[in-house]
């Protein structure tokens, strides 16, 4: 189990985009409901995703991310402040390809990696599809009170606001498709 401490911000993309000068990866994230953990097996839709002997409790969000040829299963707990429980497992591509993912809440984005003047790595997500134009930046921290040099292209801080997680955005997209 890990602990994720991060701050998230809207990005003002009308001006220079220095984050585009570095490395990036394309990602598709699918959000799962009805995931169970029984006898050391994490199951969804009667398909075994992974094996995990550790007790998994108080997890609220399950996600499968495809980035290049890497598939990652992630489970997160409820966020308190800037902190949440965070589990990550590599998943075989064969399992990913066998999953019925069509119709699931999903987001597609290009993630840029940009190093700030304080040496911290920023992940800047430029969303695709129906929320194209939305840009959110996040930075992982060692503690909630860690000092951060905030780039001048940041806008509103989203860290403590509900409705701006990737899971929430995926549900918003899904809801809009149904209307």
Where are these regions (language model features)?
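Phosphate-end processing signature that detects enzymes handling 5′-triphosphorylated RNA
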Residues: 1-179
């Amino acid at each position: 189990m890990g602990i994720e401490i991060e701050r998230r911000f809207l990005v003002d993309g009308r001006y220079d985009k220095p984050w585009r000068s570095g490395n990036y990866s394309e990602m598709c994230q699918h959000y799962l409901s009805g995931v169970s953990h029984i006898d050391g097996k994490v199951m969804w839709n009667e398909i075994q995703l992974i094996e995990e002997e550790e007790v998994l409790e108080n997890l609220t969000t399950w996600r499968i991310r495809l980035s290049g040829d890497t598939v990652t299963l992630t489970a997160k707990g409820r966020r308190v402040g800037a902190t949440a429980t965070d589990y990550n497992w590599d998943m075989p591509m064969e399992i990913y390809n066998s999953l019925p993912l069509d119709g699931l809440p999903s987001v597609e984005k290009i993630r840029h990696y940009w190093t700030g003047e304080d040496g911290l790595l920023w992940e800047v997500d430029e969303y695709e599809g129906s929320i194209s134009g939305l840009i959110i930046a996040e930075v992982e921290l060692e503690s909630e009170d860690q000092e951060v040099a905030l780039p001048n292209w940041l806008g509103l801080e989203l860290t403590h606001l509900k409705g701006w997680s990737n899971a929430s955005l995926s549900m918003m997209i899904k809801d809009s498709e149904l209307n």
